[in-house]
Amino acid sequence: MDEDEQNRYVAQLKDEFDSCDTTGTGYLDKEELTALCHKLSLDAHLPLLLDTLLGPQHYARVNFEEFKEGFVAVLSRSLDFSTSEEESSYLEPAVPEEVKPKYVKGTKRYGRRSRPDKTDLELTADSDSLPFGTDKVEANGVRRAKLRRSTSLESVESLKSDEDTGSNKESTHHYFVAQGQLKLWNQDGTGNCQRSSDNQQEVTDGQVRAVWEELGVGAAGSLNREELSLVCDHIGLKHLEAEELDALFRKLDKDQDGKVSLIEFQSGLFKPHDHASPLSTSTPARPKPLRTISKALEERVVRSTSPSLLSATVGQRLLTRLDDGSGCTSPEKVMALWTEEGIHNSRDILQTQTLDFSLEERLCLAELTLALDNELLVSGNGIHQAALVSYKNEINYLQVLADQACQERDKAKADLEQADRRNLQLVREVDDRHATMESLNESKIKDLEQEFRDKLTALRSESEYESEVLLEQVEKERERLRDELQLLRSQDISLQEDMCTTVNENRRLEEEVSALKEKLTEAESAISKLQNDLDRLLQDKYDGLDANGTGLLNQEEQFTEIFKEYEQQCRELQDRNDELCSELELLKSQGSGKRTRLSRSSLPANDWSNRRALTTESDSDDPEMKKGTSPQVRKKLQVTDKNVLGSLESLAPPVSIETELAMEKMKERYEQEVQDLKIQLETKVNFYERSMDLMRQNMEVERKDISQSFKMEISELEDLKARAEERAEQMRQTTERLEAELRGKTSGGAWGQEQERRIQRERAELEQNYAREISNLVLRLTSEKDQLEAELKLRMDREVLLVRAQLDEVTSENCALKDRLAVLQQDVKSLEEDVNNKRKKLEEMEKGYMKNREDEERLRKENSKCREEVLDLSARNLQLSSENAELSSRLCTDQRAVQTLTDRLAQVCQERDAAAVSSKQLQENLQQQENHGLRLQEQWRKEKELLERELQTAKEALQHLTVVESALTSQTLKNKSLEQDKESLLKETAENDQKLKKLQEALRNSETQIEQLNAQILTMWQEKDVHVQEAAAHIKMLQQSQDKVQELEERISQLRKEKEQVQHTHRLQEETAVSVLQNECKSLRVQNKELQNKVAQLQSRELELQRLTHECLTLRNKQAELETAKQEANQQAMRAESTRSMVQAQHTREIQELKEQMGSGTQEHASHLQTQLAEQQRRTQDFEDLLRSQAKQASVQMGLQQEQYEKLMASMQERMDEVEAKLKNTRVMLQEKVNQLKEQLAKNSKSDVLLKDLYVENSQLMKALQVTEQRQKSAEKKSFLLEEKVIALNKLLRKIAPASLTA
């Protein structure tokens, strides 16, 4: 290790020392030293280090140099005692033990002379024990000579550098694997990984890019999640779960952009970490690098006791791979090997005198090795070539075996260290996770308890408040129902009185109808009498006339037939009237029966009305709406109510207080809704019954009107009869007058043929006129009759259609109500099912929560057990590692003993005769040693199997821990999902409540609409009744209505004019407001432009100010440069002065020397010196002049620059003052503009308010206009109806008048 690396390591140690120096004095006390040792993982050597540094003085303090010396001393001592022989086992070659041959024949020796080489399994088993050192020392104190480590800090740190240089031989892929595993298992930085040295090989960008290009990922310079999984699989992080991969991706993605860049990947996976070394050893337990073959050969040459080339290079024999286990091989194999390597006379070589090996017997490899060794030492012929080829082959083979053994040993060490790190890290992670889970669960439980308490208090307060509100509402409703009951009773009494009056009126009307019938029969009999009289009179009058009289008689017969037909029609109409009267009586009897039933059922109806909670004002104001419902409806409602309440009461017992309160609320709400539905159904049934009663009443009224019209028709017919009688009387008088005239004319004899013709003409004209009038009467009566019948049919059809339509509406509404009730019942059932499901879910959630608690407790216990097992396993691993280290040390001692025995065996070979007995003893000792070694190997193998089984159990425990952790995570996810389900259920209940509220609102809206429609129908019926009752009065009020219509038209015209005026004024106001706003907008735009210009000016001024400040800064920089130049000039002047003084001193010194020389020198030398002195004086003078001129120039330049700088500063100050004044002015102007804008905004707000007021007034006027238009439309409709009624009355009058005229 060079000096730079040593200084760097000392600096690192100094940084750690300073980090523990809390006082900052450079000294550490006992507590700070313990903290530093804990950081350096020297807890095992802490007492020795404290005793070395502090001694008996516990309150002493130590500086860094003292700590460094004590640290090196303690570390070297620990290296002497605790470093096991595994270092020498891989630093030194394993020399095979030589055994005494079993049979000796002359110069030839047969049998094994060395131990069989260990198999690969044994090599790996030996390597497993290498990382664990032992502190035990052999009791006899016999220790083999080994390479000791240096006790200095340089040697300790050089070990790290050697290891690092050895690790550089690994490939990039293996480096990736190691780094990835280290990153995976040491994410918290507390594993057992050693501190990375500074010269560790870092992964470059090129290597990472090469891996990415090999996999075909990271084309855009970043990785997504799938590409990261591919890279992790490639570099050795295989079998990662999805959660671990997500955690690694989130950790690498530092900027949270969803991708991992190259820098993030390299810094996240391959950055160096400082980790504490394991507690079992004080030296870094890193995998030992492979030594080079040259170094191993050198050490073997150094350590070998045999002077031969064979023992120095490859051991005591060659061609080991041809050995079949007995130390011998067939000569054919050796010859085949030599012939393969190019030696063709292998048979001759084996049969030479020097080697003298038989081709029929088996060839001993040890003897061949010794023979070849001797030949190499003696001669240099072809035998040497065979020996060299054999050496080369053996060396290559041994190199391969050594490399494999070292690799397997390093791999086993790394696996053991990694398993220890994983165990410790898993224990820590499990502890941390359990602690975090416990804290999270406790915090969640506390939060849930607090939430439940808050909700419980809120629900209690809400329930108390709602109960108080309900009590108040019940009291108010009770008072209101009492008032309604009193009203109903009073209305019942008034209705009974009205019924009595209507019954009396009906009787009176029946009596009048019977009287009118009698009068009608009398009139008919009088008409028949008058008709007979008229027939007789006409027959008597016109008997004496000529044959033309027969035509008159025929016409009279026709007239009589027509009258008979009319009489028949009158009888039919009378029959029709009788039928209508009978139907009217039936309807009256049905109405009286209904009233008696209603009066009987008034008591239970009143009881039922006491339970009504929510009724509309229209129902309470209308007395007909207070009647009770039918018993069937009541029974159905009671049955559904009982079923629903029973279903609600039969629910499962409450699970928690919150669910109980929610269930009570839902139950109360449901009862209230059912009660509302019952009340609504009652009101609708009452309304429809009342509407049926009103229809019946209307029918009675219409029938009364019809009877009245018939009475009027009868009176009109009576008038017609009277008129006919008067006309008959007039005709009788005219006939009598005519007869008298005829008699007078006939008696006077003055009548001639002309008078008879004139009489005949007059008679013919009279007959024609009479016939024409009769035909006109007949036609008019038939038309009026047809019209009356058609009107009656139309009216009856309309009434029947109306009744049917109303019945259809009632039935459809009843069906709709039934469907609605069924839908509501289904909704109630669905709500009950939802409540049951929610309750079941809540129970399941609570069961799952309890189960989770139990699982958590069980997992805690299992984790504690696993933790204890892991600790036991780690302790067992440490114990077994120490035992393995002890066994390895014993093996090393045995190998050293074997080495000594081989040395002694070589001496015995030189002294054959004297060493026979000693060779036998050595053979026995070797056999014992072999047996002991075999026993040790067997014991070590068993312990290794035990360790492997324990490792397997530890792995299974770790797998179980991972399964437990996954179960915990799944359980937490289940808890989260259950909480989400709970929240979703609560949301669903809230949504269901909102849906119920919406349904209730829709029901209320529909009820209000139905009530409005019913009110409209009632008003229409009332209006119809009023119009029917006031039909007679409307004829008189027609003129008034026309006047009113004219007034309304005038008023409408005035309103239209006012509307036009208002619209005109509104338009004018809008136009003025728009013009004002446009002007303001224009002014604001102009002001905005001005402000923009000013802002641009300000920006330009700011730019100019920035430029000036920049110039000022440049001037200041120039001034600073000038000052530095001035200082430099002054320094130069000072230097010049100093040089001048030095030159003068030197000059004086030279003059003194010259004077001294002149005293002893010659004249020539003096003259020469004088010339030199003159030249020197001239040079000094020139130099002084030059310095003076430079100083003057510098002073002049400095003055000029100072003057320029002062001028620039003055001009800059002036410009700054001007800019500040301009800025002040602009600020004042901007403030004024801001104030103006504020005033303008206030004006705009006022104008907006005025506009809103105008819009409001306009809307009000529009509403008033709409109301007036509606009133006008309704008045026009009423006037149109009145006109129609007047026209109908006029038609009736026209029909009735001709009949009276004909009569």
Swiss-Prot record:
Bias category Polar residues: which stretches? 592-617, 1159-1175
Q: Which SMART domains match?
A: EFh
- Kindly give the InterPro entries that the UniProt entry links to this protein: EF-hand-dom_pair (IPR011992), EF_Hand_1_Ca_BS (IPR018247), EF_hand_dom (IPR002048)
Q: Tell me which Gene3D superfamilies the record gives.
A: EF-hand (1.10.238.10)
- This protein's species is Danio rerio (Zebrafish)
Q: Which residues bind Ca(2+)?
A: 253, 255, 257, 259, 264
Predominant location category: cytoplasm
Q: Where is the signal peptide?
A: none
Name any Gene Ontology BP term.
Answer: photoreceptor cell outer segment organization
- Provide the function of this protein: Required for the intracellular transport of organelles and vesicles, and is essential for the photoreceptor's outer segments formation, maintenance and function.
Name one cellular component (GO) term.
Answer: ciliary basal body
SUPFAM superfamilies cross-referenced by the UniProt entry: EF-hand
Protein name (record):
Ninein-like protein
Disordered: annotated span: 107-135, 592-634, 1156-1181
Q: Name one Pfam family in it.
A: EF-hand_5
Q: What happens when the gene is disrupted?
A: Morpholino knockdown of the protein results in severe morphological defects including ventrally curved body axis, ventriculomegaly, pronephric cysts, expanded melanophores, small eyes and circling swimming behavior. In addition, morphans display shorter retinal photoreceptor outer segments (OS). In ninl morphants, in the inner segment (IS) malformations are also found including swollen Golgi complexes with enlarged and distended cisternae, accumulation of vesicle-like structures throughout the IS, large vacuoles and dispersed mitochondria.
Recorded superkingdom? Eukaryota
Q: Which residues form a coiled coil?
A: 464-590, 660-791, 821-876, 919-1146, 1202-1278
Q: Where would you find this protein in the cell?
A: Cytoplasm, Cytoskeleton, Microtubule organizing center, Centrosome; Cytoplasm
